[in-house]
Amino acid sequence: RKMVNAMNRFGDLKSKAESSGDRDLEQAYRLITSERAKAAFNLEEEPQQVRERYSLDPRANLQDSNNIGQQCLLARRLVERGVPFVTVNNTGWDNHLNLATYANRNPGDSRSASHALIPGLDKAIAALIGDLADRDILDETLVLIMTDFGRTPKINSTGGRDHWPNCFSVAMAGGGVQGGQVIGSSDALGEFVADRPITPGDLSSTIYTLLGLDPSRESVSYTHLT
């Protein structure tokens, strides 16, 4: 509901967009304020059982813009309508101190960070992949679950985990991915890669290949070059 109301307020920017002379700004305005966009962002159209499938708290699903279940449900609606690239952000994982309680990030929350974050993410991802499969669009939709770096395997002096780029995992589903396999392995503590290290370049090449693009081909756009 908040998303729909926010989009309705974009009407105040109509004159600015039309008088700017910026074609990209005008196009972005038309896209955001279109009836198709408004319909896509209206999660109230979804049956209650679908919202419950995505969220640990279906009531919060329509109110909290940071709710991972709501975001994944919205992602599915956008994909259904032909949006080619959708990003879902799940925040709250940067816990450098006191992992035993989540209250340092959310006052009043007595759960540990893992108990506060993992169940919702787990349910949302499972719901998204299952829902895409039920609608026969998983095979044409690549789902990528990743972060920019991992966390230190050892707890630091303040009871948290710091940034750790040496070893972490990425999950992929749909889009032609052969499921049911794990590529590479870490040592016993999860500190370093023990077998088949995968680089960012390897990951990018896999994504390009699944999208039907040749990762070895260099492409240059001259559209904005003078």
Predicted regions and their residues:
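Ligand-binding pockets and gating/stacking loops
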Residues: 1-225
